[in-house]
Amino acid sequence: METYHLEQAARRRIAGRLLPFVFLLYAIQYVDRVNVSFANLRMSADLGFSDRIFGLGAGIFFVGYVLFEIPGAIIVERWSARKWIARIMISWGIVTVVSGFVHTAHQFYTARFVLGVAEASFFPGMIVYLTHWFRLSDRAKAIAWLMAAVPSASVLGSLLAGWLLSIRWFGMAGWRWLFVVEGIPPVILGIVTLFYLTDRPAQARWLSEAERNWISQELEAETTVKKKIRSYTVWQALSSKRVLMLIVPSVLAQIGAQAVIFWIPTFIKRLSGLPASRVALLVALWGLLGIFGMLLNGWHSDRTGERRWHASVLSTANY
């Protein structure tokens, strides 16, 4: 009974401290990644960009992202999640602010590519970080909390964009302020991350000694079991049939998802003729249901211990 109470106390304390914070970080990251879709409601007209220029600029982000995604995740595992995530946030915040001052297509392409490099490995790094704190039986709920930041960011980002696009401070267009204003929070939160996050349970002064020992032993036991089954190098993992079977549907799903995310504000505006503020409100609506769905799916996956169908059915229904 004493062990049970210790376990429950440790799990609550870890979840209560880490999950709201990583949720906030990912929400801010996602807002900054897709804010260009709302900026485009005014930006392309102001700068004379064609749809081709905007589409290439939106997509070139992922070239930089893919190149540095895996190396960054390895750094999180082998060095320090706290320091690396802080570095990511500060650098992407600065690049986002600078994006508000582009004037040419080449400047736009460069800003998007560098933003991809700056943000690369944030999401996989977060997943790796959560494995340092949550047992396998708790991991789906933790990841669901993280993923719920995406629809939440859609709601927050849409409402904020609707307001920012309507302003014109100091003679500067609202879409420029959209980048500047939304680039400041990650810089601040990056600094906060250095002091707030803890890399490993053994370093957590905010846990009691008994709680630190319990979670460390639980995670170490899981690691030992996995190593006995098989230990993979990075290249072995990337060439694994199971990994490839996950990569292919994920890539296909993201092709559709990112196309919708980057173009839906423009499509709605062209089809409806509504002002930017109304367009932003319509885009925000789907996020409200997404928050509920992700948290419910993660909770039910942990409750039943089933992963495959919870991932595949929801993904198929979504896309």
What is the predicted role of each segment?
Residues 17-51, 157, 260-265:
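Extracytoplasmic
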Residues 36-37, 235-297:
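Extracytoplasmic gate region of multi-pass secondary transporters
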Residues 111-149:
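Cytoplasmic helix-loop-helix junction between adjacent transmembrane helices
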Residues 59-74, 284-297:
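Central cavity-lining transmembrane alpha-helices of secondary-active solute carriers
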